[in-house]
Design a protein with these regions (language model features):
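Conserved G1/Walker A P-loop phosphate-binding module
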Residues: 2-173
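Amphipathic alpha-helical protein-protein interaction segments
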Residues: 28-32, 71, 75, 88, ...
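Amphipathic alpha-helical interaction motifs in eukaryotic regulatory proteins
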Residues: 43, 96-100, 120, 192-196, ...
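Beta-strand cores of modular interaction/reader domains in eukaryotic scaffold and signaling proteins
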Residues: 81-83, 117-120, 169, 203, ...
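Conserved beta-strand elements of beta-rich interaction domains across eukaryotes
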Residues: 89-90, 123-125, 175-176, 208-210, ...
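Conserved C-terminal guanine-recognition region of P-loop GTPase G domains, centered on the G4
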Residues: 141-266
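C-terminal end of P-loop GTPase domains and the immediately downstream helical coupling element
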Residues: 228-370
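Interhelical loop segments of eukaryotic multi-pass membrane proteins
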Residues: 363-391
Length: 392
């Protein structure tokens, strides 16, 4: 029953997330930004081919999987994945709500987010649980290996079109804390696994007491081993530290703690951000929210370039494999022709040999007496006359 409900949820979500008629899809694409359209078009070329749902249209993946080719290709995602990590109460969920201009994630001082929540754009407000989420995001198959995680992965589908949200999948993560706090799964290992499958990682530090959380620092150190280029750091809730020298002190503490754990620390930046509201409207505090948005926009542009390059490379590899298979086929055809001609020649020679042997056997069996009489009565007298004439 649970699986049936998950399947029903998934089908409903997909119906409202992009699986529509060609006319509806064309109208929907016209409303998208250029980068969204490019990402969607690349995804469709891999999935359905250049003619979409038309009969006979074949996608790049299906071509690559042909038994004669077997070229390994990965389908690019049609959205940019943004992973947000940090200690609890760092403002991760609040930032997502602000970006999409919708209160879709629960926020508060308490540890509200105990699992991973995908926040994505669709045509109907929808909430998906673990089974449906894993079915919706097929690249999450490996995440199921973490015991206890399936019941703690969710998807929230929002109808928001704010900023570049239609091109983004936000991943809200559990707040990281030290001490006796127990998670129902290995949260650090799960974050590291997800980092392999995202395009951008935003790290938020809460300046009020938790910025130097040991668990957060360990996760950041591990992420820097493989994903240093994906990481962007921010001190969130800067408006809660009213005095400039207090903010500078917190920034220095965070920077010192991170300096020995991250790569390229000489280029390290830690801008301060806070979400604007009526209470801080007149605050004279630097707010780098626009930089966060620019980081996200940059990730979208880079993903577009990366997907275009990947598609070009995949098509080139398929083309080379096709040429290789055709050349191999021509070689085999030529060899088959040679073998056929050789076989025909041997067959003809065998028939000649059989005919000759049959003729010899026939002569030996039936014509020996006739030949002897012919020689004695005809050839021999003429030979005698010839020699007699010479002797005379």
């Amino acid at each position: 029953m649970q699986m049936m409900n998950a399947t029903k949820q998934l089908m409903n979500a997909k119906d409202h997330a992009g699986h529509t008629t060609d006319n509806q899809e064309k109208q929907f694409l016209e409303q998208k930004s250029p980068n969204e359209r490019i990402l969607k078009s690349i995804y469709d070329l891999y999935e359905r081919g250049p003619n979409g749902n038309q009969p006979g249209s074949v996608g790049i993946l299906e071509i690559a999987k042909d038994p004669l080719l077997v070229v390994q290709c990965w389908k690019p995602r049609k959205k940019v994945s943004v992973l947000i990590i940090g200690n609890h109460s760092a403002g991760k969920s609040s930032f997502i709500n602000w970006y999409i201009d919708e209160s879709i994630q629960t926020t508060g001082v308490a540890i509200e987010t105990r699992g991973f929540t995908y926040v994505t754009s669709g045509r109907k407000r929808e909430s998906l649980k673990g089974d449906a989420t894993f079915a919706f995001y097929d690249h999450l198959d490996g995440l199921e290996k973490f015991e206890g995680i399936q019941a703690n992965v969710f998807t929230e589908v929002s109808t928001s079109k704010e900023k570049n949200f239609p091109a983004i999948d936000f991943i809200d993560t559990p707040g990281l804390v030290d001490g006796e706090m127990e998670y129902p799964f290995d949260v650090s290992a799960a974050i590291l696994w997800l980092a392999d499958h995202v395009d951008l990682i935003l790290v938020f530090f809460d300046p009020i007491g938790q910025a130097l959380c040991g668990r957060t620092m360990k996760v950041i150190e591990a992420l820097n081993v493989k994903h240093a280029e994906k990481l962007s750091y921010y001190m969130s809730k800067a408006d809660q530290v009213e005095k400039e020298h207090d903010r500078q002190r917190v920034l220095i503490q965070i920077t010192q703690n991170l300096s020995g754990r991250i790569n390229n620390s000489h280029a390290f930046k830690l801008p301060t951000i806070y979400l604007p509201n009526e209470h801080n409207a007149n605050a004279n505090i630097p707010n780098a929210l626009s930089e966060v948005c620019e980081d996200i926009d940059k990730a979208i542009r880079l993903t577009v370039q990366k997907n275009l390059t990947a598609m070009k490379d995949d098509c080139a590899r398929i083309d080379r494999k096709v040429v290789e298979v055709l050349e191999e086929d021509r070689t085999k055809r030529a060899e088959n022709v040679k073998r056929s001609m050789r076989g025909a020649a041997l067959l003809a020679l065998s028939w000649v040999f059989i005919f000759f042997m049959t003729f010899v056997a026939f002569v030996e069996l039936f014509a020996f007496r006739f030949v002897g009489n012919f020689v004695r009565k005809t050839i021999m007298p003429r030979c005698n006359d010839f020699f007699a004439a010479i002797l005379m």
